[in-house]
């Protein structure tokens, strides 16, 4: 599963020609026909909702109101009760910001969702295409609407402190003001129809999978706080809290997290979570080491912490650490900039470096997951080619989930399965829906991006197959993508190298043909946690320059190519950074490389061997031999799947 990349502003480059001289253009996203794009594209009439919101804005003396996508924890994925931007605008994509003035409304989103937004927004809304020349950013549009000393409002829990500070400084230049509106105005419009917050039980994540007790993790965090001379750390990111306390939840679909905050000081540990969500096992697990407090008490307690600290130490009081992703509301509760030091979270940094137990779990769960994928693709080919069955994309995705669920330690999926046939594969974040999705065409490319949550790890894998006869064009595109996968997988680099620097290794073969893909190459992956995990990754995001790749990092390796209206190709493996031995050690520093753990065959009939170097050909054959050795025993009583796996892992040659 992938992150987006900012749209490229330069003109599209004409593409290579295959042996058959058919043109392969650079991807033009989202011009796919509505009948093939499965998201419900029905326009929502927002007139009544906007009218009510504007009444509330006037009551609160606000001229412009901002509605972000995020929740109070700045989560990438949110619970239904936090879908405020979708409710007010009708746009259901995962990324975007809505801005409403007393007379206008605008929705800003990125290139993944331009088509979807244009279909879902009614005529009350203006679409701001992020990164496209001629369209203002949402901040610029907001500033323009606020000219003349107007007041801009936002729920301070839904915007980062740095984001609020930046916007406030911009608004001040034209005499306008940013204010925090404590009561969320969209919630008031939503009223009783707003989904209730989830009340799922929290569960213990055993140390045999976590690899370290939560007491050890907190002790290490306190050492970090001491080295920074900090008064404490207020934790707001849900995956960081789950990891720190060795707990998991089910409050957000596909993400095993639970709504909570935490405060860690040199002498106290407090977890803010609704007590009725804690089982006796969780209570016993936390014991006397952790004080449980009501979820909603965090803001008042943060304020009290800050006041107490100032009274005890006066002007020399040390500051509280706060993640640079934490909300403006939390920062204000702690006394604002003067009392807070915004940092990249030390918990996030520690979580990204998996311990030996977590790494072993990732290896093990990917073997089981690979066996599930092998069974699935063998089944799918048999249904489509031999039985001539009619299957739609959802039927196939459901079958994959059913197969995965048979394996040990399976908990659920790690994201919505992207099961896409033909041109649907060119839609980056395609999500098939029953009743509107496509029938799988055995004579077209099939792209499947899927993943699962297991107690011992999280998986994320993309495979692209063709169950008929691929064209020379498709084979060339697929092989260029495969060369990129191998390029990153086999990289050797000095300690201190960033994912930003490594990105070119996966793109180089497409670049040589004047081609590219408009998403990141790789993202961090949690250990039975979020499938997207920072701060590390491989791509062109500025944040990927900040933290170098380190041993124990687990990331995806997923270059792709997308021919709009025809097909999409992506190959994704999970790789783990480790120290490697080199002939020399320039600079007397460690050198790093990667270990791949994904164990699913790569579509053999899509590979054009003549485009591979001898080393790349050896990599493919070695990889397929490894898959056979590690997974064939799963099929001792399934001769068809075993034969399919044997065929798909046979050596290839030029």
UniProtKB/Swiss-Prot annotation:
Needed cofactors: Mn(2+)
EC number: 3.4.11.9
Residue numbers binding Mn(2+) 1: 460, 558, 572
Keyword field: Aminopeptidase, Hydrolase, Manganese, Metal-binding, Metalloprotease, Protease
Reaction(s) this enzyme catalyzes, per UniProt: Release of any N-terminal amino acid, including proline, that is linked to proline, even from a dipeptide or tripeptide
UniProt enzyme class: hydrolase
Domain of life of the native organism: Eukaryota
GO terms under biological process: proteolysis
Pfam families: Creatinase_N (PF01321), Creatinase_N_2 (PF16189), Peptidase_M24 (PF00557), Peptidase_M24_C (PF16188)
GO molecular function, one term: metalloaminopeptidase activity
Presence of the UniProt keyword Nuclease in the record: no
UniProt remark on cofactor binding: Binds 2 manganese ions per subunit.
Binding site for Mn(2+) 2: 449, 460, 572
Record carries keyword Hydrolase: yes
Gene Ontology CC entries for this record: cytoplasm
Family recorded in the similarity comment: Belongs to the peptidase M24B family.
General function of this protein: Catalyzes the removal of a penultimate prolyl residue from the N-termini of peptides.
Protein's UniProt name: Probable Xaa-Pro aminopeptidase P
Source taxonomy: Eukaryota, Fungi, Dikarya, Ascomycota, Pezizomycotina
């Amino acid at each position: 599963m992938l992150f987006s990349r900012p749209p490229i502003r330069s003109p599209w480059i004409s593409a290579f020609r295959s042996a058959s001289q058919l043109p392969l253009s650079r991807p033009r996203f989202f011009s796919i026909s509505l009948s093939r794009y499965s998201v419900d594209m029905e326009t929502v009439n927002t007139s009544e909702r906007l009218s009510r919101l504007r009444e509330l804005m006037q009551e609160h003396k606000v001229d412009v109101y901002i509605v972000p996508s995020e929740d109070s924890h700045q989560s990438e994925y949110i619970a239904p009760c936090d879908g405020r931007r979708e409710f007010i605008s009708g746009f259901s994509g995962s990324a975007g910001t809505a801005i409403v003035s007393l007379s206008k409304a605008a929705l800003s989103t990125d290139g993944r969702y331009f088509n979807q937004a244009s279909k879902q927004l009614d005529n009350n809304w203006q679409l701001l295409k992020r990164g496209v020349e001629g369209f203002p950013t949402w901040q610029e549009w907001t500033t323009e609407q606020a000219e003349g000393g107007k007041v801009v409002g936002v729920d301070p829990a839904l915007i980062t402190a740095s984001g609020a500070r930046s916007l406030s400084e911009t608004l001040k230049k034209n005499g306008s003001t940013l204010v925090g509106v404590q009561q969320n105005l969209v919630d008031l419009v939503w009223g009783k129809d707003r989904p209730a917050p989830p009340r799922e039980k929290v569960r213990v994540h055993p140390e045999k999978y976590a690899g370290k007790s939560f007491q050890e993790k907190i002790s290490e965090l306190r050492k970090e706080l001491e080295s920074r001379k900090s008064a404490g750390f207020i934790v707001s990111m849900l995956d960081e809290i789950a990891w720190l306390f060795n707990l998991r939840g089910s409050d957000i679909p596909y993400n095993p997290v639970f709504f909570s905050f935490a405060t860690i000081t040199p002498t106290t540990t407090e977890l803010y979570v609704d007590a009725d969500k804690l089982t006796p096992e969780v209570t016993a697990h936390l014991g006397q080491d952790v004080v449980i407090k009501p979820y909603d008490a965090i803001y008042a307690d943060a304020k009290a912490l800050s006041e107490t600290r100032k009274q005890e130490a006066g002007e020399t009081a040390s500051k509280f650490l706060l993640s640079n992703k934490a909300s403006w509301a939390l920062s204000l509760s702690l006394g604002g900039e003067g009392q807070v030091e915004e940092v990249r979270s030390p918990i996030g940094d520690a979580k990204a470096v998996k311990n030996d137990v977590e790494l072993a779990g990732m290896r093990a769960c990917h073997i089981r997951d690979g066996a599930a994928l092998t069974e699935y693709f063998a089944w799918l080919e048999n249904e489509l080619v031999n039985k001539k069955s009619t299957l739609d994309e959802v039927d196939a995705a459901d079958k994959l989930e059913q197969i995965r669920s048979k394996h040990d330690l399976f908990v659920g999926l790690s994201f919505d399965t992207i099961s896409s046939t033909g041109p649907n594969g060119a839609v980056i974040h395609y999500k098939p829906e029953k009743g509107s999705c496509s029938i799988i065409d055995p004579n077209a490319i099939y792209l499947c991006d899927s993943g699962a949550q297991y107690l011992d790890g999280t998986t994320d894998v993309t495979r692209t197959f063709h169950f008929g006869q691929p064209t020379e064009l498709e084979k060339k595109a697929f092989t260029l993508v495969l060369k990129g996968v191998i390029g990153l997988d086999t990289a050797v680099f000095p300690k201190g190298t960033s994912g930003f620097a490594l990105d070119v290794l996966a793109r180089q073969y497409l670049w040589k043909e004047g081609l590219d893909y408009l998403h990141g190459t790789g993202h961090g992956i949690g250990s039975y946690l979020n499938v997207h995990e920072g701060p590390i990754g491989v791509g062109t995001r500025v944040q990927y320059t900040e933290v170098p790749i380190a041993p124990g990092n687990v990331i995806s390796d997923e270059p792709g190519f997308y021919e709009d209206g025809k097909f999409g190709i992506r190959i994704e493996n999970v790789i783990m950074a480790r120290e490697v031995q080199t002939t020399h050690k320039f600079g007397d520093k460690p050198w790093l490389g990667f270990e791949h753990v994904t164990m699913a065959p790569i579509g053999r009939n899509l590979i054009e061997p003549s485009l591979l170097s001898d080393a790349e050909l050896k990599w493919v054959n070695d990889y397929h031999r490894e898959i056979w050795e590690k997974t064939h025993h799963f099929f001792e009583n399934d001769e068809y799947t075993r034969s399919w796996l044997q065929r798909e892992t046979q050596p290839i040659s030029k």
